[in-house]
C-alpha cells in the first residue's frame, strides 16, 4: 500500500445536472432498490440536508457499532488499474487460469475476460451481445479502457425503477467526464452515436463519478479493486470525523455502521477522504474530486484535536519545534512554529512536505518490511515528525503487509515494532474521536 497526497490545485469547476425526483420520490426509489435488505423499521430516513443536498438522518438513537444498513450495488465494474491482473472475470472477479489475454477473453468475440462458469450466464449474454454489436477493435488483447467503462455500460440493462433512481441521484458535470465517453468510443468500431443514448451514457458517468465507491473483492485469494454505485450509501454527506463508516462484504455489498452514538434527528455522515490525512491533503482531495471545500470542526482546528497530522519540523536554525498551517480556509496557508512562533510561507513548507512524501513513497514501493521498519525508526525522525500523516501511512503500510498480505514469519522484535505502530495509530484515531471506525476494526482484526 503506497501513500499519496493530492496535487495542490484549485478545485475544477463543475455544475450539477437537474435531479428528476423529489426527496420523497428518491426515498421511495431507495426502498425499491433495497428490496429484501430494507429493515422493517429503519433507524434512518432520507431528508434534505443542511450540509448538502439530500442526506440520511437518524429516526431514533443509534448505538455505537450498530449496523445502519447494508446495500447491494446498482452498478459495478472493474477499475482496470495498471496494477490489476486484467485476466479477471468481469462478473465473479476470479482470476482466470492461463497466461495469455486471448485465453481469458470470451470466445464469442465481445472482448471481455470471463471465466468458464460465467460465460453462459444471462448477465454475460446481455453484455456480450451489446459489445459484439459495437464491434470491439481489439480481439486478442484485453483492452483496459473497455473494462473501465463496463460499470457504466451496465446502465443499459437496468430496469425502469433503477433507471429512475439513477436520474434521481446527484450528478455533477465535468468537462473531463466527456473524455471517458470518447475513450470508450475509441475501443469500438460501431459505438452508439444516437443522442439519447449518449445523453443517458453521460448522465450515468456523471452520477457514477459523483457517488461511486472503490471497493475490494477477494475471491479465492485474488484481490481486485472495483468501482461500485450504492445509491443509499451515496447519500451520506461528508464530515472529516464522521459518525458512521462503511466496509464491504464483497465487491458488490456495502455495510454501514455507526462509529459513535448518534442521537435521534442527527444527520448520519461518513468521510470521503482518508481519516488520517492532514487537513490540507483532505481539502485538496475533496476540492479536486468532490468539488467542495470542507469547513467542518476538524478542518478549522490547526492541531486536528492535538494529533498534529500536518506537522513538519521547524526550519529555523536551532529549533526543532513543530510547524503547522495557521489558516484553515485556504489551500495555501502560512505555517507557524508552535515553539519559536516563526512564520513560514506555504511554498517553502510544501516543498518539505513533498520531500517527505516522495522519500517515504519511494521506500514503500521498493523496500522489504524489515527495511521499512529500519527506515521508519532510524531515518524518518531526522526529517519528519512522528505525527506527520505521511509517516503514519508508512506505519499502516507495515501493519497491512505483516498482517494481511505477507505470509512470511517475523521475529519477535519485528512484531513488537508493528504492535507499537498499531498502538500509535489507534491513539490518533482516539484523539480524533473516530470511534468504532472501519480503520480501527481493520487494525484490530475485527473485520478482514
Swiss-Prot record:
Gene3D superfamilies associated with the record: 1.10.220.160, 6.10.140.2220, SET domain
Gene that produces this protein: SmydA-8
Keyword S-adenosyl-L-methionine among record annotations: yes
Family: Belongs to the class V-like SAM-binding methyltransferase superfamily.
Classification via InterPro entries: SET_dom (IPR001214), SET_dom_sf (IPR046341), SET_SmydA-8 (IPR053010)
EC number(s) recorded for this UniProt protein: 2.1.1.-
Disulphide-bonded residues: none
Name listed for the protein in its UniProt record: SET domain-containing protein SmydA-8, isoform B
Top-rank taxon, per record: Eukaryota
Domain SET: 42-273
PROSITE patterns: SET
GO cellular component, one term: chromatin
Species lineage: Eukaryota, Metazoa, Ecdysozoa, Arthropoda, Hexapoda
Keywords recorded for this protein, A-Z: Methyltransferase, S-adenosyl-L-methionine, Transferase
Listed GO biological process terms: methylation; negative regulation of gene expression
Amino acid at each position: 500500500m503506497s501513500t499519496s497526497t493530492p496535487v495542490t490545485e484549485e478545485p475544477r469547476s463543475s455544475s450539477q445536472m437537474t435531479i428528476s425526483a423529489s426527496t420523497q420520490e428518491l426515498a421511495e426509489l431507495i426502498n425499491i432498490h433495497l428490496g429484501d435488505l430494507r429493515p422493517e423499521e429503519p433507524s434512518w430516513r432520507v431528508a434534505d440536508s443542511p450540509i448538502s443536498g439530500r442526506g440520511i438522518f437518524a429516526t431514533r438513537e443509534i448505538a455505537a457499532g450498530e449496523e445502519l444498513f447494508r446495500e447491494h450495488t446498482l452498478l459495478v465494474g472493474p477499475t482496470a488499474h495498471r496494477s490489476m491482473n486484467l485476466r479477471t472475470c468481469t462478473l465473479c472477479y476470479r482470476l482466470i487460469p492461463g497466461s495469455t489475454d486471448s485465453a481469458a477473453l470470451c470466445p464469442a468475440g465481445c472482448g471481455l475476460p470471463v471465466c468458464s462458469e460465467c460465460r453462459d450466464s444471462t448477465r454475460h449474454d446481455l453484455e456480450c451481445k451489446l459489445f459484439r454489436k459495437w464491434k470491439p477493435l481489439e480481439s486478442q488483447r484485453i483492452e483496459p479502457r473497455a473494462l473501465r467503462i463496463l460499470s457504466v455500460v451496465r446502465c443499459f440493462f437496468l430496469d425502469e425503477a433503477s433507471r429512475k433512481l439513477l436520474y434521481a441521484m446527484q450528478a455533477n458535470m465535468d468537462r473531463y467526464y466527456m473524455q471517458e465517453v470518447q475513450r470508450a468510443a475509441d475501443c469500438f468500431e460501431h459505438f452508439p452515436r444516437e443522442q439519447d443514448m449518449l445523453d443517458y451514457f453521460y448522465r450515468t458517468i456523471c452520477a457514477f463519478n459523483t457517488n461511486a465507491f472503490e471497493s475490494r473483492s477477494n475471491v479465492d485469494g485474488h484481490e481486485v479493486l472495483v468501482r461500485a454505485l450504492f445509491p443509499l450509501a451515496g447519500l451520506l454527506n461528508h464530515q472529516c470525523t464522521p459518525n458512521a463508516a462503511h466496509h464491504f462484504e464483497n465487491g458488490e455489498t456495502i455495510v454501514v455502521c455507526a462509529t459513535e452514538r448518534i442521537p435521534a434527528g442527527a444527520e448520519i455522515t461518513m468521510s470521503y477522504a482518508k481519516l488520517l490525512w492532514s487537513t490540507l491533503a483532505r481539502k485538496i482531495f475533496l476540492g479536486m474530486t468532490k468539488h467542495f471545500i470542507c469547513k467542518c470542526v476538524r478542518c478549522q482546528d490547526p492541531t486536528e484535536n492535538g494529533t498534529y497530522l500536518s506537522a513538519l519540523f521547524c526550519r529555523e536554525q536551532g529549533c526543532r519545534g513543530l510547524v503547522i498551517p495557521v489558516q484553515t480556509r485556504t489551500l495555501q496557508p502560512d505555517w507557524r512554529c508552535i515553539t519559536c512562533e516563526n512564520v513560514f510561507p506555504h511554498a517553502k513548507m510544501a516543498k518539505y512536505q513533498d520531500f517527505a512524501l516522495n522519500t517515504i513513497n519511494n521506500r514503500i514501493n521498493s523496500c522489504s518490511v524489515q527495511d521499512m521498519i529500519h527506515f521508519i525508526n532510524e531515518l524518518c525522525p531526522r526529517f519528519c515528525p512522528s505525527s506527520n500523516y505521511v509517516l503514519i501511512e508508512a506505519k499502516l503500510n507495515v501493519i497491512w503487509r505483516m498482517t494481511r498480505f505477507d505470509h512470511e514469519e517475523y521475529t519477535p522484535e519485528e512484531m513488537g515494532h508493528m504492535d507499537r505502530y498499531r498502538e500509535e495509530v489507534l491513539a490518533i484515531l482516539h484523539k480524533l474521536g473516530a470511534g468504532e471506525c472501519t480503520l480501527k476494526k481493520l487494525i484490530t482484526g475485527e473485520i478482514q
